[in-house]
Amino acid sequence: AYFGTGMEFPAILDTKNLDLPYNKKSKKIKLHKSHEWSLMLDDIVEWYNRAGIILIYRPNEVSLKWWLQAGGFNITYPNYDYYIDEKTMAKHIAIQNDSILKFAHKHKLTWEHHHKHHDILIAKKFPK
């Protein structure tokens, strides 16, 4: 499920909110995705210490270009009005990417290239 501004579910790190998209009786692993959680990674580690984290990194300019090619402001869902324009979106991408890189460095995570997309790097942090 996707969480964040303009998404069906807000990017709030509250168990009730995080459980909303899922069947309450299910024991399956839940996958929660949000660009905004890049700014809350330390909180996720502290509050949900049994949760794994997978970081996806793509350079700022490439991220913006991909987002525009995927439809940018011209798609109906999610609603990206919050980001106002391309310049503002680029600023948000840069802030989120910076947060991802700082978290990976702080936790000494290893980056691996995506198997198909050479410009995407992946790092994983799982509980010990």
Question: Where would I find each of the regions flagged by the language model?
Answer:
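PAPS-dependent sulfotransferase catalytic core
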Residues: A1-K28, K128
